[in-house]
Swiss-Prot record:
One of its GO terms (molecular function) is ubiquitin protein ligase binding. This is WASH complex subunit 1. There is a cross-link at K219 (Glycyl lysine isopeptide (Lys-Gly) (interchain with G-Cter in ubiquitin)). It comes from Rattus norvegicus. Acts as a component of the WASH core complex that functions as a nucleation-promoting factor (NPF) at the surface of endosomes, where it recruits and activates the Arp2/3 complex to induce actin polymerization, playing a key role in the fission of tubules that serve as transport intermediates during endosome sorting. Regulates the trafficking of endosomal alpha5beta1 integrin to the plasma membrane and involved in invasive cell migration. Residues 369-391 form the WH2 domain. Residues 432-446 have a biased composition (Gly residues). InterPro entries: WASH1 (IPR028290), WASH1_WAHD (IPR021854), WH2_dom (IPR003124). Belongs to the WASH1 family. The VCA (verprolin, cofilin, acidic) domain promotes actin polymerization by the Arp2/3 complex in vitro. Residues 296-475 are annotated as: Disordered. Residues 302-318 have a biased composition (Pro residues). The gene is Washc1. Residues 466-475 have a biased composition (Acidic residues). Residues 1-167 are annotated as: WHD1.
Length: 475
């Protein structure tokens, strides 16, 4: 007798107990019953042994957890009476292994004992002859439900099918304004070509037409989008009672005395800021204003006058003119010319000393660098108070100088008054920085040197009237 292999009904099922087949001979039925019971006993023993091993493994794991709990409890009891603060550092990651252990089934590695080779038995008895009456008797004990109804043949449907339940009148069965029953035969009428019949197969081959657009497109209606539901867990603090207690209570059981609630307890494990970032001081911006000196009573002082021009260079030597010997000058004329020269020299010296004494320190001693130079320019009033001359004024002045030179050349007759006038003009040119050798080119003398050009020239000398003077010169 060979073992009957049975297919497993469930995926992953290891064991499969064989069933005893009907209509067996007596010896054959007894042999299969004995084999099935022995197979069931082996399976039961294997199952219970595996369950016992898994229970023992779980018991050892539980014992290890209990040892860890007892160790933690002993540490808690040790530090329970301490009054010093204890730092507890928690790991930034969850304390779990990198690779989790996969779950192993209880029946991992189990083998089906039915696949083992068993001894074969030879039975001498023969099978009984087939008896139909005996088979009919078995139907009483083994009911068999067999469907005897024949399946209906597929009939060609030509109409719309069965009548709907909501039809209230016979006119609803007929096509509009016709006598055709569409539920019996589907047709459509054409007033020109007549009635055309469509079968069920023709209806199936027709192309499906698009349905009408929804109201949101046809009527331009906008559907309101429902608000998404939030399933996040947001715990609430609830009502917290207000407790008025002192800030420090000494000698409390289980409370440390050296508690420190600050950010200087040490570097944290997690990469986070130790505390709030301190606020930086605010800087006030000031607008630069020109320097304005003030008096003690708070009134503003006028800016100092611009520095005067440098002292005049020594006048050039007059050109020698060959002429006839002239009579000696009278003492009155000599004294007049001496007084005029001394007054001009003294006036220019006093003006220079006053200008040096009245000038600001930044101009007199420009040793403080660029800031001092800018400050002195601001105090002097800048380019707006320099009184610069335009090109037209220069051209007009040059014309006047040429005319004066022509008049001087014509009036130069060798007398004493014309010579004195020429010397005074040369003196004025020397003061203004325009010597006879400078020519028409004008160097960068500065705006203040041009201010002296605005001094009006002396009037031309007048010829002395009277015959007495002529008589004196002739004598």
């Amino acid at each position: 007798m060979t073992a009957v292999k049975t297919q497993h009904s469930l995926a992953g099922q290891v064991y499969a107990v064989p069933l005893i087949q009907p209509d067996l001979r007596r010896e054959e039925a007894i042999q299969q019953v004995a084999d099935a019971l022995q197979y069931l006993q082996n399976i039961s023993g294997d199952i219970f042994s595996r369950i016992s091993q898994r229970v023992e493994l779980s018991r050892r794991q539980l014992q290890a957890i209990g040892e860890r709990v007892s160790l933690a409890q002993a540490k808690i009891e040790k530090i329970k009476g301490s009054k010093k603060a204890i730092k507890v550092f928690s790991s930034a990651k969850y304390p779990a292994p990198e690779h989790l252990q996969e779950y192993n089934s209880v029946f991992t590695g189990a083998l089906d004992p039915g696949l083992q080779r068993r001894p074969r038995y030879r039975i001498q008895s023969k099978h009984r002859p087939l008896d139909e009456r005996a088979l009919q008797e078995k139907l009483k004990y083994f009911p068999v439900c067999v469907s005897t109804k024949s399946e209906p043949e597929d009939e060609a449907e030509e109409g719309l099918g069965g009548l709907p339940s909501n039809i209230s009148s016979i006119s609803s069965l007929l096509l509009f304004n016709t006598t055709e029953n569409l539920y019996k035969k589907y047709v459509f009428l054409d007033p020109l070509a007549g009635a055309v019949t469509k079968t069920h197969t023709m209806l199936g081959t027709e192309e499906e037409k698009l349905f009408d657009a929804p109201l949101s497109i046809s009527k331009r209606e906008q559907l309101e989008q429902p608000a998404p539901e939030n399933y996040f867990y947001v715990p609430g603090l609830g009502q917290v009672p207000e407790i008025d207690v002192p800030s420090y209570l000494p000698d409390l059981p289980g409370v440390a005395d050296d508690l420190m609630y600050s950010a200087d307890l040490g570097p944290g494990i997690a990469p986070s800021a130790p505390g709030a970032i301190p606020e930086l001081p605010a800087f006030h911006t000031e607008v630069a204003e020109p320097f304005q000196p003030e008096r003690e009573d708070g009134a503003l002082l006028a800016p100092p006058p611009p520095p005067p021009p440098p002292p005049p260079p020594p006048p050039p030597a007059p050109t020698a003119v060959v002429s006839a010997p002239q009579p000696p000058m009278s003492p009155d004329v000599v004294t007049v010319t001496g007084k005029v020269a001394r007054e001009e020299d003294s006036g220019s010296g006093e003006a220079h000393s006053a200008s040096v004494q009245g000038a600001p320190k930044e101009v007199v001693d420009p040793s403080s660098g660029r800031a001092t130079l800018l400050e002195s320019i601001r105090q002097a009033g800048g380019i707006g108070k320099a009184k610069l001359r335009s090109v037209k004024e220069r051209k007009l002045e040059k014309k006047k100088q040429k005319e004066q030179e022509q008049v001087r050349a014509t009036s130069q007759g060798g007398d004493l008054m014309s010579d004195l006038f020429n010397k005074l003009v040369m003196r004025r040119k020397g003061i203004s920085g325009k010597g006879p050798g400078t020519g028409t080119s004008e160097g960068p003398g500065g705006a203040f040197s041009r201010m002296s050009d605005s001094i009006p020239p002396l009037p031309p000398p007048q010829q002395p009237a009277g015959d007495e003077d002529e008589d004196d010169w002739e004598s």
